[in-house]
Amino acid sequence: SGIDGDEAWATGAALADVDNDGDLDLYVCNYDSPNALYLNDGSGKFREAAEEYGLAQVDACLVPSFCDYDRDGDLDVFLLTNRYYRKGGRPVEPPFEEVAGGRPRVKPEFSKYYGLKEKSPGSYGMDEVGRPDLLLRNDGGKFTDVSDESGIRVDGHGLSATWWDYDHDGLMDLYVCNDFADPDNLFRNNGDGTFTDTITSVVNYTPWFSMGADAGDINNDG
């Protein structure tokens, strides 16, 4: 079939018509190695084309979630990330250093693994940090990172991402489940390419250790 995966540590995958030709392609998230896109040629054969499409990101990618959020006729993708795990575990020596007259900072070689958390005024401790999630817009066969301009880039320990139109305005919104010390996010689609996190005004309670979410009309009210 042409799908081999090499020796990458695959963490999540989705079937979606990425090239908009009427058949399902396969997109695979890999941990700390390039993500893979296998395009379906319609005969049971696939070819790898992640670099060509701008989808060969290298990060702590976990789950891809496809949706045509901008309603232009092709599928965009939200890449959920989690965190990097340092080989050998936590370092013996503190991974941060003191800065004269200011807050301590994480040493550059540890910055993708750890962050500083203020435990009390002037007292800091080490904390594992989640990686920033990515929103990639499909611009006719080439994906563009619009995470910052869309307002959807959030660092967290993401575990699932669910698209659905929660406010019934015809635009797909996004619910992101985060684990550990990170709150969930509910990104309302503003219709102009930007999103607003409305979680605190819409959802009264979130567990702060979410691992999955789904949506449905439970009370059958439309």
What residue ranges belong to the model's regions?
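Acidic, glycine/proline-rich Ca2+-coordinating loop motifs
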Residues: 1-222
